[in-house]
Amino acid sequence: MWIPTEHEKYGVVIASFRGTVPYGLSLEIGDTVQILEKCDGWYRGFALKNPNIKGIFPSSYVHLKNACVKNKGQFEMVIPTEDSVITEMTSTLRDWGTMWKQLYVRNEGDLFHRLWHIMNEILDLRRQVLVGHLTHDRMKDVKRHITARLDWGNEQLGLDLVPRKEYAMVDPEDISITELYRLMEHRHRKKDTPVQASSHHLFVQMKSLMCSNLGEELEVIFSLFDSKENRPISERFFLRLNRNGLPKAPDKPERHCSLFVDLGSSELRKDIYITVHIIRIGRMGAGEKKNACSVQYRRPFGCAVLSIADLLTGETKDDLILKVYMCNTESEWYQIHENIIKKLNARYNLTGSNAGLAVSLQLLHGDIEQIRREYSSVFSHGVSITRKLGFSNIIMPGEMRNDLYITIERGEFEKGGKSVARNVEVTMFIVDSSGQTLKDFISFGSGEPPASEYHSFVLYHNNSPRWSELLKLPIPVDKFRGAHIRFEFRHCSTKEKGEKKLFGFSFVPLMQEDGRTLPDGTHELIVHKCEENTNLQDTTRYLKLPFSKGIFLGNNNQAMKATKESFCITSFLCSTKLTQNGDMLDLLKWRTHPDKITGCLSKLKEIDGSEIVKFLQDTLDTLFGILDENSQKYGSKVFDSLVHIINLLQDSKFHHFKPVMDTYIESHFAGALAYRDLIKVLKWYVDRITEAERQEHIQEVLKAQEYIFKYIVQSRRLFSLATGGQNEEEFRCCIQELLMSVRFFLSQESKGSGALSQSQAVFLSSFPAVYSELLKLFDVREVANLVQDTLGSLPTILHVDDSLQAIKLQCIGKTVESQLYTNPDSRYILLPVVLHHLHIHLQEQKDLIMCARILSNVFCLIKKNSSEKSVLEEIDVIVASLLDILLRTILEITSRPQPSSSAMRFQFQDVTGEFVACLLSLLRQMTDRHYQQLLDSFNTKEELRDFLLQIFTVFRILIRPEMFPKDWTVMRLVANNVIITTVLYLSDALRKNFLNENFDYKIWDSYFYLAVIFINQLCLQLEMFTPSKKKKVLEKYGDMRVTMGCEIFSMWQNLGEHKLHFIPALIGPFLEVTLIPQPDLRNVMIPIFHDMMDWEQRRSGNFKQVEAKLIDKLDSLMSEGKGDETYRELFNSILLKKIERETWRESGVSLIATVTRLMERLLDYRDCMKMGEVDGKKIGCTVSLLNFYKTELNKEEMYIRYIHKLYDLHLKAQNFTEAAYTLLLYDELLEWSDRPLREFLTYPMQTEWQRKEHLHLTIIQNFDRGKCWENGIILCRKIAEQYESYYDYRNLSKMRMMEASLYDKIMDQQRLEPEFFRVGFYGKKFPFFLRNKEFVCRGHDYERLEAFQQRMLNEFPHAIAMQHANQPDETIFQAEAQYLQIYAVTPIPESQEVLQREGVPDNIKSFYKVNHIWKFRYDRPFHKGTKDKENEFKSLWVERTSLYLVQSLPGISRWFEVEKREVVEMSPLENAIEVLENKNQQLKTLISQCQTRQMQNINPLTMCLNGVIDAAVNGGVSRYQEAFFVKEYILSHPEDGEKIARLRELMLEQAQILEFGLAVHEKFVPQDMRPLHKKLVDQFFVMKSSLGIQEFSACMQASPVHFPNGSPRVCRNSAPASVSPDGTRVIPRRSPLSYPAVNRYSSSSLSSQASAEVSNITGQSESSDEVFNMQPSPSTSSLSSTHSASPNVTSSAPSSARASPLLSDKHKHSRENSCLSPRERPCSAIYPTPVEPSQRMLFNHIGDGALPRSDPNLSAPEKAVNPTPSSWSLDSGKEAKNMSDSGKLISPPVPPRPTQTASPARHTTSVSPSPAGRSPLKGSVQSFTPSPVEYHSPGLISNSPVLSGSYSSGISSLSRCSTSETSGFENQVNEQSAPLPVPVPVPVPSYGGEEPVRKESKTPPPYSVYERTLRRPVPLPHSLSIPVTSEPPALPPKPLAARSSHLENGARRTDPGPRPRPLPRKVSQL
């Protein structure tokens, strides 16, 4: 049976459990589990990492841990009772683990590695804590390290600041909010402002001395020198070096280094230097022989200095090399370091160029104990400590020092009868009173043990030597008396024996007879003469002699005259036990001189403070001894002396001695009667304060009152102990009288001078320290009443001195911080007076910082859960006194501007935060009773209204993001919890008092506004938190957003008809709330919108306002990243359900649908905008949203905003044409008026005319950059008209020049024609604006199908490319996936006159072929009926699909949606007609190009003629004859009579063209190709005979073929899918011939270039029953065009191999050898004059199997070749230039074709008209549709490596083109030769259906361009002359100006103007 667990609540998994048993819970080792129930060795519970999944697991798998349970029951919370630091470490490391991996993903390597080291360090420290073997101090140290690293990691990762107390996390529920704030602020300030260390230490390590002339041992002496004061400031660090310059004791590294300690900040300045003096030990002269002398002398060697400023920049861990200078003049040795510092080192020599002293220096900061811990490895070896000279800045009690510093300064000696000066050495000894030498009390420096004697260094031949050597004598105090120092002087001989001869001595006693030590300063000692054998061991012989000249001069002047020798030393005593002050000794020995007591007491103030504190206890005993001796006589004097000593301890240097005095009072003070005299004297001083003129002494007394009361209280306690409590009442009366005097003194006002105020301030400063002393004698309530009366006596008038006000407040603050205030009984007495003074200051807004601190302390004492009666009463008092003023104060200080300086800003933030914390503390402590009392305290509704408005405003301020630092989440959550609790209380008051007739809009609006911004706080968005953090917040506070949301809903429902006041104002705020991804909150809040719609419907009959506001806010909110797909669905479903029964349901559904659709588009837009690069999705999504705002919502401002967003996207993607069209949308909204427009987006305030002008110029610029110059010309004309109307001729001139430049660009610059692709987006995973729709996209320059398909797959990486072109079924539409269907389509231009006119250059026509395109199509061949295996063309039909777009391309996007599709089936006969028409047109073009020398060689024409004639001879067109001219077909298809006749006409026309072509070919064919030409002529006659043609009539021969537009025309778009009858098999063939320098072009049979769309189709190749499938292709060329060898044609595949989903692998390799399509190169690099598609040919170089490429090193102009005058032009007067001279070619004109009257094909839903020819840049792709009329002899093509077989069964054709890089064609042709005459062809009619009516486009309409040719006429031979039928047209007219041209019938016709545009809409003031 499962039973709930009592103690087993928490455990850690010690072995992984798979949970394979029923209800098993899968656990991993290390997981923590919470246990709910147990049963027979099993537990039931959950893992803390996933508390939602509960299950069972074996109890043996879990290690139980102690834990405490909070909130027992269903929602119990288990907290482990282990060390809180361990718990925090565990949870923090888990959080870090996830984030640490993310750092690696984000490539933040530095932080990644640093955090890894910190995590490992924390784990190691965690193990140390868990083991539990650490001492208390070590444990504290480890925890400090742990928390420091946890805080560092949290800060680096952007996590929350953790409040801590004693290294443990603090639960905010367990402490007051003010205390929580202080903890947070302390940690935050500690993080931001590191504490500057007050103590510094210098670590010095000696490495070596590098010098070339070593060989003797050395002494190195380090010290710190103050160059400003010219004195050393530290002891010396002494080190011995061996002969190699290395430390002498290598086994003792601690001797190599020292720590110079206790350097204050004042010592860290640039004039403090490290000085190094080096002394050598050896011979007198450095150059003497080694054996010259056996005696060793100390001799000067060198000196080095270093400024300590060089170390202040940071830690110097690298060794420093100090330059060592040698002293040339030994007499200056004592000041060598000073001269080097002063840069006077030129007088010294360096020890060597590479010489130097290698040292390591490091500056350490902090307390010495901290340094010991951090550098324990150094201190563990006993590194020497080098002290400062004298005491530290702070003298610590108990510090024992007795150091006498002796500096051997200088000496004056006589020659002693010698001719040269002496070499003097000084030897020093310390001798005690018995004459014995004291051992080991002479210290040369730290690092060297003390010695018994000292030998000075020797200066060579110097009778006035100066040494300046500092020595320390650490002599014990007990050995000082009677001891003296003896100095012996010896002359050091330089002779071989090296003798030292004693010639004199000096001595100095250490202590004088009166007990004073040797005074500090310089002492000139007498040098007493003596001999070497003089016995100085007997001290009695010389101690009676005078030792100092100063003393001797006073006693015996005559004796002094005998000696001129002297010796000077300087002494300095640093002792805590001995004194040099006689006055101090006199005071301590007062009993021996009673008569001097008064004088001694008076002189006490003159004694140095360090002397007093050294003998503090003795001094105090002396004072109270004198007081006991005669209190009447010495009472006031002793009191003053005591005050002086007390105040001396206030000095920072001596404040550490306060505990010494406290100890004295508690343990050593024995003055039981002293209290009487102390009270009496103190009262005497207080009574005279108001009368005294000088208050300085009185203020000193008041300053000392704390310790005076301590002495009074201790004295009274001693008296009570001694007497059993006698005179208690008397004592109380004395205290009462004293305090009455104080109260009187405090109540007085300062009159005139501020002295009284200063005295009052001094008293108040120290008065709170008295409380604790009074509590030792009086009851708490008594003391509280005394203090209350005293503080109450302060003057409350506001005009008193501000400084006194501040001191008064400080006194209040100290009172609150005192022990007295912590007691509830005394606190209740003191609280009113504290609050009274606080109220006054807050009301005046004075001393806010101090007020905040006091308030914080007040609330720190009130715990959260304290429900004691006294606490409740305190809260009552505080609420009544301070709540209102506290709210006003917060409002006041938060409305002020923040100070600029950082220090003031911190102070400002602190005071604001503390007041906020105080308010929150107060509100958290308030209970229902407090709130009720508060609300009842307002007498009128106006007062209540003001209070509610005030507190709501404050709450809004409190939840501002800047109120607390961003990582203070704990504080924010606590604040929010208090706010929501308070709001719940106050909402009742709102309902009860401000509804119905008392309704107040302002207060309700303030309430709702507060609630909304409360919910929207960033710190409450739990979705952004880590799982562990979210869990903690939910456990402690729940989701406060839902609570507040429910409150909003409840309050809204209470409003009733007053809801109308908040519609539509609250729609936006509420909408923002509902966008928060919290399901419960959304379910609560969304229904409010239904309520708003309902009330708005009641008021106005509609809810337009609601709709408008919803739409406006949705855009801005969703652009901020709010909202998601779930919200859209929830919004839709909830509101639809709500309005089901409403009468206005229909309009409501419409609104909801509109808003939902807008959300769909906004979500798509936001998702797309997250992408990095600009792609089609971004642009398409923006277009969708833009159109939605315009068409469905009519939101003009939003529409314009998105126009500019789209414009920016286009510019970024360099879609300049689309950018121009986009900006044109805004331009159309404006008029040429002077209406002023406001500033909007990037536009300044300007008139509508100016903005429209600016837009025009910008659009023209973009059309220019996009090479859409025709559109730019239209806008140039429009703006020129405006300039002309305003007579602005300057700008008019510029505009006309700009227009002219655009015309030049049309004629001179090349333009690449884009490909067009149809893209289908299927499946539900696509964005809304693409889902299950098809589009036609305009490709980028040079972009082919493969590249486009790859681009689309990159944009949609999860999409699947469909492998067929069939319409997808419904399963694809509804699939939860993305499917892409892509294939190329052919643009069908609108019928425009410019495309059919003669003489219009192709540069002009090319624009209209690919611009303003609404219609596109592609074809699919299929068999209908029985398939004839002998002639498949009988049953081969073509399915032609036409696509109509919603807008023409190009436009505001590179792609537009397909609005309509039409499918037409073309019969086999119609297909045959198209094939022949296009092949004839191709032939005409090639012949024309050859005739006018536009071809670089004749190979293309040769190939084309060969293909057509060969195919015809071998049965080509006979297939058509067999299929359509037989009797059976004619009888069975009587309706096709006209079409059959048309087919026959085309055959005859082809024969005429071929004959004329052969004549031209013969004229230009090179010699090596003559055999081929002869063969073609022979085969042509065979072909004619096969067609039943013998000879053309004479009249037909008389006229040449007339080519309209100057060339034979290939109308690829008129019938692009013509199919020839012999296309059933694909037979690859190779030609054995490869002609160098000869172009080979495909010239397959009757199928033409117009069958381009068939190139997208895969047809049957072997089996006649195969289904023909559509294939993607980047081009739309035909099977047999001159460009049929495109990259998409393979030798074995019947369709494009490019991205072909059905192409087998064996075919795909052929792409590598395919030719480039012409559009892959600049058109002029292929042919000089771009005229017609059939004229664009690609030169393929045949050689080494290399594919042709456009030279990448050539610029576009270099690749282009300009056109030349045509020799076919009837109005040319000059013959064409040779191409080698001019590089220009031009095509002959092409005659117009009459309209055909044939009927369209059957099964046609819509038949498109015959469009103009395709762009010259269009590459051609071999169409699958075979042609029977092209054939090449096997001998020509059977084995050619670059030629492939035709698709005709058994009929070969050239399907690849080969070009050469050079051509000799132009050199072989006579420029004057004329073409051969050919018969005039039969007119070719065209057929087609009606073009559907198109909607108006927003793009500039195409305009007709009639250009009068500038070519000079060239006469033609009579045989080729063509009658003049028309004159070339003039230039295009200006808009609205009628232009006419001569037509063929002689009539004039007016040039049609541009397509009418809609009237511009009125635009708002944008």
Curated annotation (Swiss-Prot):
Annotated region described as Disordered, given as residue ranges: 1648-1729, 1742-1966
Result for mutant: residue 1884 to M: Found in a prostate cancer cell line
Compartment list: Cell membrane; Cell projection; Cytoplasm, Cytosol
Chain ranges of the DOCKER domain: 1190-1596
UniProt motif SH3-binding: location: 1788-1794
Alphabetized SMART domains for the sequence: SH3 (SM00326)
Record text on subunit structure and interactions: Interacts with nucleotide-free Rap1; functions as a guanine nucleotide exchange factor (GEF) for Rap1. Interacts (via DOCKER domain) with RAC1; functions as a guanine nucleotide exchange factor (GEF) for RAC1. Interacts with the SH3 domain of CRK. Interacts with FASLG. Interacts with ELMO2 and EPHA2; mediates activation of RAC1 by EPHA2. Interacts with USH1C (via PDZ 1 domain).
Domain note: The DOCKER domain mediates interaction with small GTPases like RAC1 and is required for their activation.
Protein name per Swiss-Prot or TrEMBL: Dedicator of cytokinesis protein 4
